[in-house]
Amino acid sequence: MKPVRKFIGIFIASWFALLASSSTAFANSSIQKVIDQKYKQPDYVIGSSLNEFEVEQTLSLLMYNEEQEKEWKTMNPSAYTSFRIDENGDHSSSVKLQKQAKKAPVSVHIVTPQNITEVTADMHRNALTTLGLEHADITIASPTEASGLSAIAAVSYSLEQSGSKISDENKILAQEELSLLAAIYKENARKNNFHEDKLNVAVIDLKIAALKGSNQDKKLEKKDFQKLVTRILETYQLNGAITDKQTKQLVDFTSKLANSKLNSDKNLVKSFKALKQDIIEKAGDSFNTIDTKHDTESLLKESDNLPLYPMIGLGLLILLGIGLMSYHVHRHQTKRNKL
């Protein structure tokens, strides 16, 4: 029995390895499950830097009802570190998170746009979708001037306190994306050939292409991501605005995403597509001269390459079959020798 046990053991171990690699998908699906089950009433998370008076201001801005709603939370400073944010920094961004009445892309409303200086609502929507949210209503407020970059950590804190499991990889990629979007917007906002809606949709296309293109038996190289970013920027008429440095940053981010475990989350691409369509529909005539329905998913794919996981599974089945055949041949020969 030793040969067959050996091959069965290899097969089972490899199967569990594949399951482990898709743990991100299960973790992210639990995020939406928690939102649907536990956020019929909104949850409030207050920035860690606010004093008592500012807390009262913020709760009022977020329309908190003490008599009808559950107790609000203060952000734990140490929770910022998983997003690579300095826990000792000045964090005044606060959030309200609630289940949506209807299933639509993540909604973000900034009630103090004069104080949130670096991050727009759609930038937050983009990064929060990368974090793993599918459908939720989020309100952001700050009583003092703030970048807004720490709001995503407050959303994550609320979800984890309610039982969600969010991987560090999701957190880091979402925060890096938010910071990159904010930096590109800040440097290019006054250029005539720059448009924030186009930037957000371009980044969504980069994410879709990276996640779908990475799920194949082909090691993607830096030049593949460089070609992808160049093509997407040209498609959305941003190549004249985005600098070489920013292009390189987009290439690096896309490469990290493609090499992450996020490609095992089947709902993520679906969420990105829904968000893309929503932004385009609300952007007026900004996309009239752009082909927004191009085949984003295949930009990093090669048609003659089979997906990696099915190939691994097929290989394991072949090995198992060879093992069983070897065992039966060995057993038959042993019986003949005894005779």
Set out the residue ranges of the language-model regions.
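Basic/polar, acidic-poor N-terminal "presequence/leader" segments
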Residues: 26-103
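Signal peptide-directed extracytoplasmic domains
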Residues: 79-133
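Juxtamembrane/start-of-transmembrane alpha-helix segments at the extracytoplasmic/lumenal side
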Residues: 300-317
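Bacterial N-terminal signal peptides that target proteins for export
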Residues: 1-11
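Membrane-proximal extracellular "stem/stalk" segments
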Residues: 218, 227-305
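Soluble oligomerization/assembly scaffold segments of membrane-associated complexes
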Residues: 123-252
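C-terminal segment of classical bacterial N-terminal signal peptides
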Residues: 17-25
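C-terminal membrane-anchoring or membrane-association module
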Residues: 316-339
